[in-house]
Amino acid sequence: MGRIKKKGESGAAKNYITRTQAVRKLQISLPDFRKLCIWKGIYPREPRNKKKVSKSATASTTFYYTKDIQYLLHEPLLAKFRDQKVLEKKISRALGRGDVSDAKRLEGNAARPENTGKPSYTLDHVVRERYPTFVDALRDLDDCLSMLFLFANLPATSSVPAKMIARCERLCLEFQHYLIVSHSLQKSFLSIKGIYYQANIQGEDILWLVPYKFNQRVVGDIDFRIMGTFIEFYMTLLGFVNFRLYTSIGLKYPPKFDATKDDKAADLAAFTLEGAGLTSNGAQPDAIMEGTSESTPDPKLQAKVNKLVKELKSGEDEKPKAITNGEGESETPTDAIDKFEPAAPGGDVLLQPSYSTSDPSQLFANCTIYLSREAPRQALEFILRAFGCKRIGWDEVLGDGAFTTNELDPNITHQIVDRPPVTAVDNDEGEDNQTAQKVGGRVPGRIYVQPQWVWDSINDEELKEPNQYAPGAQLPPHLSPFVKARAGQYDPTVPLEEQQTEAEALKGDSDVEDEEEADGAEADEDDDEAVLAIENGEMDVAGSDDDDDEEDEEADAGFGGFSDAEVDDASEDDEQTSAALQRQIELEAELSGKSVKASEADKQAADPKSKAKQQKRKELQRKAKEEAEDLERAKGMLSKKKRKLFEQMTYSNNKKDAESEKLREKRRRIERKMAKGKAT
């Protein structure tokens, strides 16, 4: 006979442990327990039945796996936390005894990261445990970069020390330097939250958010303790990643840092890159641009490769012979690129190849750009340098490290301004350094654009037309480059006629006709009112200017405002006019022997265009009804599980189609309104 199982010794009660029990088992404080769980990646768990798991009368809210807590018992950081706890007790006892000198001595041994910025422990082993390979670290770099860039822009407070902010900013600038040298930056997008960046490092897409540069106001209801715990781990992680990235392209890490330039707000210019990956003139070779380090090839293998290249070149120099088919017709090879069409009507839109041989990473290589004071200098400098621009200038008040601080430099080809042009005012005392932006003060031969020109150019991998981005011009919509166009969904870059369905096109045409009829009816009413006014003798005949002046003087002298009786008479006249018009329409309908609605329907039926549209609309309705019936019959052949899954898919697809149709309808109204405004 087996032994009777006791309650709480097996099953769910054994697999879970409460937070209080875990803290007591590890013999550390609750804040240290939170830190340890964040760094080791251990999260609370939700059991299926809390009553079976809880061993106390009170309902516990936080549970952990027992195996996870058992795993934490072997963590080396526990010894550091316990030593710190013992030291804090010794300091409190010394102060209780009144021994200030002993308490001061012990305080010197205590680790105060909020004051020194250097904790008594390191998280290197934790990073190695959580990320066994470098690719794993790259895949988890999104949140790391977003948090570090956020803290780099925060002001120093008691909860966020200045040394922590300085280290975050330095790590972020080092990462930006790698992106500039390797040309790994792919896309960027301006949003309300901040600026999104996307880079491709060793085949992994990394997306992070950078807040705008302005004075942050830190409120008191934010818990910086938890965020600071994440920042400690993320700083160690990004340090590892930067070291690996720099060494992979032959650069020394960390790069030389000039504190003097950093005090002058040089940002990227405060760092000097060194290593075998850089040439003597500071240019980057092709190996760095590809993201790999240089290596000396084998001489024998290189000789074979050179021989093979010569043979290929000699084969290309020979004239291609004409190809004849079975009918004797000759076909000459063409350089046309195949166009990839989707296999199914609802398939994804395929990327088409092009003849473009230009490197997107060198998009601004031939440009010398000057940034005005109101433009976001840090973001623009990073993007322009990442896409090949070597000559970037700005006003000296924005910081050090500019190619030129003279706005009137003749070598400048583009100037980025972010304010509308204003009329220049003569000033005898001297003119400001930004007067070239003013009307009549522009430098001849220079292109003036707004900052959005840079973002749209890098997202489309081509320099956009500067006329659309001129100062004061209405900018084109800034679309997100991270959204991929899918068949059937609304695409703002495609004309409306190419993506709308037949039913939507018919509905749009009918709306246009209704608006035209409404406008025509209003015009007819105005004409009828004018005719009635002439018949009643109320039309004014144009006289001389002297008569008009005399009439105006008499009216000004004798007018004392409208009386209530006159207002009532005017309203009665309007009612009589509208009633007369309605009576005339009814008489015409009586003479023809039909009702008013029937006569209007006959007018529409007499129009061949409206008849064809009505016929087409009926055909579309019949076709949609047949497709729905076929779909219902096909669903009857499915199993219950698959039918439910199919209904869920259909519901989500119909919801997306409705949203796309709503956006297309909104665009149709806007385009119609703009066309009407241009016509008037």
From Swiss-Prot:
For the region Disordered, what residue ranges are annotated?
A: 315-336, 494-680
Gene3D superfamilies referenced in this protein's UniProt entry, alphabetically: BRCT domain
Question: Pfam families recorded for this chain?
Answer: BRCT (PF00533), Pescadillo_N (PF06732)
Q: Where is the composition biased (Basic and acidic residues)?
A: 597-610, 617-635, 654-664
- Keywords on record: Coiled coil, Nucleus, Ribosome biogenesis, rRNA processing
Q: Which GO terms describe its cellular component?
A: nucleoplasm; PeBoW complex; preribosome, large subunit precursor
Q: Which GO terms describe its biological process?
A: maturation of 5.8S rRNA from tricistronic rRNA transcript (SSU-rRNA, 5.8S rRNA, LSU-rRNA); maturation of LSU-rRNA from tricistronic rRNA transcript (SSU-rRNA, 5.8S rRNA, LSU-rRNA)
Q: What is its main location?
A: nucleus
Which residue ranges does the record assign to the BRCT domain?
A: 359-471
User: Carries keyword Cell division?
Assistant: no
Q: Which domain of life is it from?
A: Eukaryota
Q: Which residues form a coiled coil?
A: 609-680
Q: Does the keyword Nucleotidyltransferase apply?
A: no
Q: Where is the composition biased (Acidic residues)?
A: 511-530, 543-556, 565-576
* SMART domains, alphabetized: BRCT (SM00292)
Cross-referenced PROSITE patterns, in alphabetical order? Answer: BRCT
Ranges of biased composition (kind: Basic residues): 665-680
Where found?
Answer: Nucleus, Nucleolus; Nucleus, Nucleoplasm
**Gene Ontology terms, MF aspect:** ribonucleoprotein complex binding; RNA binding
- Quaternary data: Component of the NOP7 complex, composed of ERB1, NOP7 and YTM1. The complex is held together by ERB1, which interacts with NOP7 via its N-terminal domain and with YTM1 via a high-affinity interaction between the seven-bladed beta-propeller domains of the 2 proteins. The NOP7 complex associates with the 66S pre-ribosome.
Q: What does the sequence similarity comment in the record state about its family?
A: Belongs to the pescadillo family.
Q: Give a short account of what the protein does.
A: Component of the NOP7 complex, which is required for maturation of the 25S and 5.8S ribosomal RNAs and formation of the 60S ribosome.
The entry's protein name is: Pescadillo homolog
